[in-house]
Amino acid sequence: MKNIFTVLGLFFISSLMAQSIASIAYYKVPREEAAQFIRSHQKFTDLSSSDDRLLRGGGVFAHVHADNYTYVSYDFYDSVSDLEKDGPIASAALKTNIDALKLSKKEKEALTKEYRKYNRTIYYNHYDQIRMANPEMGWNFQTADWTKKKITTLSKFKIKEGMQDQFFDGWKKGEFKNKQESGFVEAITGSWHLYGEGDNIHVYTFFDSWDNFASFEKASSYDVTKDMGENEKKFWSTVETHEDEILMFIGGIDQTTGKFYFEK
């Protein structure tokens, strides 16, 4: 079984013991080049693998709805310091692993050409941020099946200054509780913004099928002419801006092998 619980769970759950860090990169890839890009991503992720890496795991989502990017990748570290140190280690591993392949001149030229194209796409067509796990926002990772693709909603919140406690109180009593009790949600997690372009809070809600996602949305529908309850009013009064996206979790790094794999 692919060890995806280790990939995601270590970031979102074991942060109870340490403040785990996620380095997040958003890639804007032309649609006609998307399949080749993700194949190259798998190849060069594998070629950058080594026992010396400080990377704890990683995952990739395909963008489905809202915003304007193709893929988003998550690399997980114990600290910002480990993140900063890992780049040179990855570069050294890439060189060592390519040398070990003992490629012919023609094969090496082809690989170099592919890498340069992959690297150019990343350099010119991405933006990034660093986030920190919030363990109090996690639910059900130990029982979720991380060997399968996930339909994922990402809710982004910018919180009004000084209203973080009220935000979390309202969120836990409302949305968090409702999702756990709905019968359609498989897992939930969240993170704080640390560096780069991003909102204060990200909330990830995972569904194991489009049917369950649709059923949850249907069950959550409400009468737009009816006033909110008191908890909802208090919660939304803390929010300065909010937006939602839909993603598809498609694969990650197996921490046992260090290799990238695609979900089924």
Predicted segment positions?
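Short S/T/G/P-rich N-terminal loop/turn motif that feeds into the first structured element of a domain
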Residues: 18-227, 233-264
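Bacterial Sec-dependent N-terminal signal peptides
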Residues: 1-20
